[in-house]
Amino acid sequence: MALRAPWIALCCVLAVLFVVPAATRDEERQKRGVDFGLQRGFSGSELAKLKLALARAQDPHGPGRKRRDAYEMERQKRGVDFGLQRGFSGSELAKLKLALARAQDPHGPGRKRRDAYEMERQKRGVDFGLQRGFSGSELAKLKLALARAQDPHGPGRK
């Protein structure tokens, strides 16, 4: 017990020595107002970055804000814009026109083609592929699969 008392007293004295000056510094900082960190050791470049960030935040045309200029207003009124005013090259314009032509093509990509054979097959129902040119082995596999499916003692049946 005798050794603990001096240590506790030393800790209390050190705490008082460190806490009191820190508290007075905070009070002085609050009295001064806005602090850009010059007292904390910010460099001049860091201060300049902070000022630029403040200026950007107050800019009405800053990031995240929509700009409305004369060109944009006119483009909204016109509708489709092929980019001639923005300086698209001839090849870019040709690509855009080709893409529009493909999109309007009734037999373009993603559209189902219906010919006479498909229409007839849909009317008939099951087709074993003889008209499409299935080989004998493919036809045999299909017939075996049908036979297994109709077997009363086949897989999945008790």
Curated annotation (Swiss-Prot):
The modification Proline amide is found at residues 63, 109, 155. Residues 33-158 are annotated as: 3 X 46 AA tandem repeats. Residues 101-120 are annotated as: Disordered. One of its GO terms (cellular component) is extracellular space. It is found in: Secreted. Sequence repeats lie at residues 33-78, 79-124, 125-158. Residues 25-32, 64-78, 110-124 form a propeptide. One of its GO terms (molecular function) is toxin activity. Residues 1-24 form the signal peptide. InterPro entries: DH2-like (IPR034439). Expressed by the venom secretory cell of the spine. The spine is a cuticular structure containing a single large nucleated venom-secreting cell at its base. It is an independent unit capable of producing, storing and injecting venom. On the back of D.vulnerans caterpillars, spines are grouped together by 50 to 100 to form scoli, of which there are eight in D.vulnerans. Keywords: Amidation, Cleavage on pair of basic residues, Repeat, Secreted, Signal, Toxin. The keyword Ribosomal protein does not apply. The keyword Secreted applies. GO terms for biological process: body fluid secretion. Its main location: secreted. Probable toxin. Does not show insecticidal, antimicrobial and antiparasitic activities. Does not induce increase in intracellular calcium in mouse DRG neurons, suggesting that it does not induce pain. PANTHER family: DIURETIC HORMONE CLASS 2. Is also classified in the limacoditoxin-8 (DH31) family. Belongs to the diuretic hormone class 2 family. This is U-limacoditoxin(8)-Dv66. The lineage of its organism: Eukaryota, Metazoa, Ecdysozoa, Arthropoda, Hexapoda.
